[in-house]
Structure formats: C-alpha cells, structure tokens
Amino acid sequence: MFLSTLFLVSLATCVICGNPSSPPVVDTAHGKVLGKHVNVEGFSQPVAVFLGIPFAKPPLGSLRFAPPQPAEPWSSVKNATTYPPMCSQDAARGQAVNDLITNRKEKIHLEFSEDCLYLNIYTPADFSKNSRLPVMVWIHGGGLKLGGASSFDGRALSAYENVVVVAIQYRLSIWGFFSTGDEHSRGNWGHLDQVAALHWVQDNIANFGGDPGSVTIFGESAGGYSVSILILSPLSKNLFHRAISESGVAFIPGMFTKDVRPITEQIAVTAGCKTTTSAVIVHCMRQKTEEELLEIMHKLNLYKLSLQGDTKNSDQFVTSVLDGVVLPKDPKEILAEKNFNTVPYIVGINKQECGWLLPTMTGFLPADVKLDKKKAIALLEQFASMTGIPEDIIPVAVEKYTKGSDDPDQIREGVLDAMGDVAFGVPSVIVSRGHRDTGAPTYMYEYQYYPSFSSPQRPKNVVGDHADDVYSVFGAPILREGASEEEINLSKMVMKFWANFARNGNPNGKGLPHWPKYDQKEGYLHIGGTTQQAQRLKEEEVTFWTQSLAKKQPQPYHNEL
C-alpha cells in the first residue's frame, strides 16, 4: 500500500501539463486525481480521461433519502482510471441497456452500488488551467431507474471538437426519487445529485482545462428530461449556460407527480414498513439493505406494461415530485410564468421514438404480438392510465394513427407512433414553444438514421429509434467498427453542431447545413442521411392531442403530458 501510494505521489510531482508521456494528475478541491491517456483514431494527441471522481459523499445510512453532501477530502493521489459502479438498479437490465446503447468498441462488465455519486471526465491531453475549453456535462437516460455515466465514452467528442466532456451519475428509482411528500423525505434526490455535480464542475473544471463560465448540460431520454427540469429549477441558476434535451423534456407524461401517497405507501407496505407517519416510513426504509430495496423494485415491477391484466391498474414510476426545492411549482406553471433559466436550448426527437428499443426493454409490446383494434385500444388504455390521458380519447386515437386500417402491422405501427408522440414528440414541441416565447434562442431537430451496429433483433424498418441520435453525438461510428463513410460523416456533423452550440449558443458553422432558429415559423433541422431544414415538427399531432385533451378537461394541456 505504501509503495503504491509513493508511486502515485511521484507521478503527481513529475507530471507536466501538456506532456502526454506522463499520466495526467490534477488537483481538485478535495485532493489530487490520477487519470490516463487514451487514443482516438486519426489523432496524434490523446485524450486525458479521469474515471470515478467522487463529487459527493456516498449516500449511505442517514444520507439515504437526503440531499447529497460534499465529498470528503483525501490526502494521497486518488486513482481515477477505472469505471465507477453505476447507481443501484436491476443489474441484468442495466447491463443489457448499456450493451445496446454504448458507443464503446469493447464491452465492460458493470458493477452496481448505492455508493455511486461519481463522474467521468474526458479532456484534450494538452489541457492547462488556462485552456478555458467549453464544458459539456452529460446526464444519462434510463427512465430514472437505469443507466450510468460509463456507458458513454466521451473521447471522440472531446478529441474532434476540443471540448471537455463530463458524464455524471445520480441516484435512481427508490434511492433517487422516494418521497413522503414532506420534510421527512422530500424526494428528487437524483435531481439534487445532478445539481451537486454541476456545483462540483463550477469549483473544479478549470483545473481540467474547462471553462466554468461555458457549461452546456445535455442528456437523452430521462437525461433530456432532467436537463429540462434543471432549466426550470431555481437551484441550478448560473450553474450552466446552454442546454440540449434529446428525446426528453419536463412534460414527459408519468415522470412527475404532485401526489406521492399511492406509490410511497405501496413501496412501504411491500417493504414491510408501518405507514403510521412519514417519519416511521423513512426510518424503516433507511434500515433496509440495498438488496432488500432491489427486491422491492422487482416485486412492484415499477413501469413494465403488458397486454395482460387489468389495464386500469398499471404500475407506476418512482418519479420527480413537487418538492418545493428543486421544483417550487408544477413544471407547467413554471414554464407558463417564464420564470426559469432562459438559456439557449436545443430540443430534439427521433423519428420513431417507440419503434423498437422501448417496447423491447419495457415489455409493453413484444415483437411477436399481433394487434387487432381491440388489443390496440386495451394497450393504449393501460398507457393512458400511466399518463393521465382520458380513456375515451383512445378509440379516436387508434383510428387516427392506424388510418382506419385493420392490418395488424399497420395497427402495431400506429400504436407505437401514438405512444412516441404522447411521450416524446408532443411534449418536446410544447416545451420548445414555451422556451422560445421567452425570447431565448431555441432550436429543434428530428433524427432519422439506422445505425449500422443496431441489434440484429431490431426491424430494418425502424429508422430513427429511441437513442439513435446518441450514437452520432458520442462518435460511435468512429469508435466502433463497421460504420459506413456516410455514417461516420453524419456523426462528425452532429458532434460539430453540438460543440458549436456549446461554444456560442448557436449550432451553425462553416460547412454545415443551416439550422434555423425555432421561432414563430417553427423551422427545425431534419438530421439523417439527408440533413435539411423543415418546418412545423409534429404540428398535426400536437393539434390533435391538445384539442382532444382540452375537450375533456378545463386545463389547456394535461398536467402530466
């Protein structure tokens, strides 16, 4: 132990910033960290990588269901060259999702732990404190219950675009969002972890070559949703300066609730805890082991949909809540009042958000299930019970999305398109309009491309599935084998758009197709094999759902949608 510590200290004393022959060692507010250099094909200069840097204390014991606390300082040099454990989750699903979406060439075996508040950093090897490079902070997706930072290798984005990439982790599921709706467990712990990571970036990223005054937060699915929540939250004011939401915004149905009682009591009862008071529940839940909480998740099956059973009693997410801290009001009210972080904002979706990945991973529509109209209505009724959509709208929606056809393939495609619009397309347009109306620069895109390394089980007609854009954003065609020149060039273009936006709040630049602002003309960019301007993304679908819902309730748009 003494010799290994001596070795790390000797590295710290001999390292010279900008000398890639020496492993990089950087000072943080809590102690020194040792990283490593990794190569990117086509670049002579490597990327400096730091893995598993703690940004908060392990959220264990009394810190379970509590705000994150600053990390404890360390005296020796901390080895930051191995992937940190991902936050507690279903291990089999977590590994499966990682293997499907990772941009890495090699596969890694993941570890999972309640001790998981770590971040990874990728920065050009010649960095110095004076580099002042744009910082891009990635928030992973996974429905607030799966995923982690290490599925995403930031080396290509960092090398090609000369930016600092930071991938953060946050508590998930019960650990991240359990709430009693009062001071005993307010909830939104995962969002508070995200805020804590952004504070860490402000305090430390300059030493890694980053500019704390030029921070872009970006994320996909639940990560894009989290970005949107952070835009609306007063806690994150001045912690970032631009934002990108990919396939996820604050209005995703079923991801936010004002009433935590049903799911909280269900969790407590399943855990064998008395529900007499909030204090009793929280005390009992803190005594449970990590394995016991995982077993509760499995018993409750918290978000799997199926065609079987009573469609009116589908299971719930453990979601973001109205806590009075992260979210002082309903997100819809905050957006309407225009009182939030009005930073430049990119919002995007994929062409077929529910094409294959989400139905497969959640089990709500296996590939071998044939649908008729009756089954389609039953499935969408179950989906509606999760999202707050009145059931009597469903038959009309089925007719619209299937174009009146009785063909099972067209019914299936229509049902999945309806789900994609309700969950992603329509909310993304509504949030973009609200952001635009503050005067903040706003951009929208729709991505449509079939990645060459998609799962062999994925149908060839699903082009632009959930998370497909992430492959381009993180340079997967460059890091993985088998991509065509067209696919590699698409990824380079997308990385350039994202990095330009991180640099100056505008994705446009020399040699790129023009990306119009999302103004009253509602211009957006169609990104894919052919990248070109278009107008009024999902206009017909937004009109259908908003008008249908307006007839059923006094509010212009449902609280959850």
From Swiss-Prot:
The active site is at S221, E353, H466. GO terms for molecular function: all-trans-retinyl-palmitate hydrolase, all-trans-retinol forming activity; carboxylesterase activity. Involved in the detoxification of xenobiotics and in the activation of ester and amide prodrugs. Hydrolyzes retinyl esters. Hydrolyzes p-nitrophenyl butyrate (PNPB), triacylglycerol and monoacylglycerol. Shows higher activity against PNPB, a short-chain fatty acid ester, than against triolein, a long-chain fatty acid ester. Shows no detectable activity against diacylglycerol, cholesterol ester or phospholipids. May play a role in adipocyte lipolysis. It comes from the Eukaryota. Its EC number is 3.1.1.1. It comes from Mus musculus. It catalyses: a carboxylic ester + H2O = an alcohol + a carboxylate + H(+); all-trans-retinyl hexadecanoate + H2O = all-trans-retinol + hexadecanoate + H(+). Its main location: other. Pfam families: COesterase. GO terms for cellular component: cytosol; endoplasmic reticulum; lipid droplet. Disulfide bonds join C87-C116, C273-C284. Induction: Induced by fasting and repressed by refeeding. GO terms for biological process: short-chain fatty acid catabolic process. A motif (Prevents secretion from ER) lies at residues 558-561. Keywords: Cytoplasm, Disulfide bond, Endoplasmic reticulum, Hydrolase, Lipid droplet, Microsome, Signal. This is Carboxylesterase 1F. The gene is Ces1f. Expressed in liver, white and brown adipose tissue, kidney, intestine, adrenal, heart and ovary. Not detected in muscle, lung, testis, brain and spleen. CDD domains: Esterase_lipase (cd00312).
